[in-house]
């Protein structure tokens, strides 16, 4: 399975199943995404913050857990990125607003923590428009995110970086947010599946 070009586009559930069945390793899977990020993200600007070293360390630990036969979370080892507006410890949370350029989160948001508890390897953040208030994804902190199907077009917003990261095969799963179509709009523009989450999920 590890040589298939379709792997980066598998669903999170498919990836988690492959990890459990030892068809692919957690570090091996992460490195596939990191290679694609290096190749494609410069033109897309979907992922705007990342900690590859910490992610590799986490992936190695996840591989050891699989090998040891430990109880695994439902998304064990699946690489994940998350919308910039969600707090993740040590990562910037600016909402694309220059006034908060130097702000870094001191703890995880509920969404981030629940995904981590489910076993994901959260390794980066994705771009948004200023204050999450537009159907495009440009801000003065991180610049513009481009549609993976046509770089001259918008990926939508406000979860534009999220939609692009999924469509371009840069991540295994994403978390966005939606009040006024902020998931629905980028999902449509980028050709991916988007679902509005609920607080109890």
Identify what each model region corresponds to.
Residues 1-57:
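An N-terminal boundary/leader segment
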Residues 52-75, 101-105, 115, 135-155:
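Flexible, acidic active-site loops/lids enriched in D/E/S/T/G that coordinate Mg2+ and/or position polar
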Residues 63-86, 120, 125-127:
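Glycine-rich, aromatic-flanked loop segments that form ligand/cofactor-binding clefts
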Residues 74-111:
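Enzymes and membrane/adaptor proteins characterized by extended Gly/Ser/Thr/Asp/Glu-rich
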Residues 107-200:
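Short glycine/serine-rich loop segments
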